[in-house]
A protein has these predicted regions:
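Primarily recognizes the serine-hydrolase "nucleophile elbow" in alpha/beta-hydrolase
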Residues: 84-143
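A fold-wide structural signal in alpha/beta-hydrolase
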Residues: 27, 53-63
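Active-site loop signature of alpha/beta-hydrolase-fold enzymes
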Residues: 30, 36-37, 67, 134
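Short beta-strand element of the alpha/beta-hydrolase
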Residues: 23-33
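Short beta-strand/loop motif that positions the catalytic acidic residue
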Residues: 181-182
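N-terminal cap/lid segment of alpha/beta-hydrolase-fold proteins
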Residues: 1-21
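Mobile cap/lid helix-loop segments that gate and shape the active-site cleft of serine hydrolases
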Residues: 137-171
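Catalytic nucleophile-loop/oxyanion-hole region of alpha/beta-hydrolase
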Residues: 39-49, 60-97
């Protein structure tokens, strides 16, 4: 994309993959965690991306819009970025689109679950590592280092816009595809 945060790094296996079918390999789209905050980046998932490629599975390590002081309520940009990255993945050469997966950690796990529920093209598997499965509970528990990450990402409290919070809440939007919660 045009913005500095709109990029993804593709990690392909160097050698022939044991998972290869018709010249294509499965791929995992990686979504990092970090309370949806700008200070946390896709560098968090780089070791996993490298390990996946070494094991014979491609990795699509994405970046997306995160909030920062003075630039909050960015949830729509975040979701737009991850949806576009998911769509772009289907266009990459040598990727087996039938075996594409999503993996996210913490707030990235939240985004992975939400993407799996909302995307037209369903992932073969969604892996959510220590995900935020209930945004409203996370907000009530003051999840994050400063206790307000979810409401700053969304831009309001659950009381101010309960419908929006339900739409962004994985527990209210179950995915119709295989899910592995770790």
């Amino acid at each position: 994309g045009a913005e500095t945060w709109q990029y993804a790094d593709l990690y392909m296996p160097d050698d022939e993959s044991p998972f290869q079918k018709a010249g294509n390999v499965p791929c995992v789209m990686l979504i990092h965690g970090g309370f949806w905050k700008e200070k946390f980046t896709s560098e968090l998932m780089k070791p996993i991306a490298e390990d996946l490629a070494e094991a014979g599975i491609a990795a699509w390590n994405i970046e997306f819009k995160r909030w920062k002081e003075g630039d909050e309520g960015v949830w729509m940009d975040t979701l737009s970025d991850i949806m576009r990255a998911w769509g772009q993945l289907a266009l990459l050469p040598n990727i087996d689109v039938q075996r594409t997966m999503i993996m996210g950690h913490s707030s990235g796990g939240h985004l992975a679950l939400l993407l799996a529920a909302k995307a037209e093209r369903k992932p073969w598997l969604t892996i959510a590592q220590a995900p935020i499965t209930d945004l409203i509970d996370a907000d009530a528990s003051e999840l994050s280092d400063e206790g307000d990450a979810a409401r700053r990402w969304i831009g309001c409290s659950p009381q101010q816009n309960p419908t929006l919070w339900q739409q962004l809440n994985p527990i209210s939007n179950p995915a119709d595809c295989p899910i592995l919660l770790v």
